Amino acid sequence: LLIDMADPGVTTKKITLISGKSPFCETFFDNVKVPKENLIGEENQGWTIAKKLLQHERNFISNFGLAGGGGSSTKGIVGIAKKYLGEENGMIADSDFRAAVTKHKMKEHAFGLTLQRANDEGAKASAASSIFKFYGTEHNKERYELMISALGNKGVVWSGDQADDNEKDITRAWLRTKANSIEGGTSEVQLNVIAKRVLDLPT
């Protein structure tokens, strides 16, 4: 059913996140009446339509696996690591951290090629969207975990003057990545969808 948010009985309440922002809200329906003309599709088939919408949403969210963290030398993961961990011969000084970043960037490149291949093949929103959404959001969380690690004690500040604006932005973005793996269906839900609809595993 399409419901007009201005209808009597429809109210919303902001949800304050750990970041202090409120981009989401909860909606309440108190004795709301909706005309039958607002029915989309067939009766009792709303979940079928909702699943299609979720597939498109998951496709969109999966791109965070590529877009998050920035690609510039000053804001990207490599630039952050060089600034806070030091640089030797143009490379990140800490060899263990350099290896972790290299592994991350290789996975990111492979993920980008996979998304491009799916696009070139004309793939539409499907259960495979769950694969892209799961991997993309988990990869984005990993990216920010690495950046927070490189920041050291600067990575636990999101207000005040103990960190600069860029450092605080990274911390806030790191917190935001936790929501990426919840919205559009949690990572656990995606794994269930992959098992059932992609791999056809027994339930």
Would you name each region that the model predicts?
Residues 1-79, 196, 201-203:
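FAD-binding core of flavoproteins
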Residues 55-203:
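Alpha-helical interface subdomain recognition
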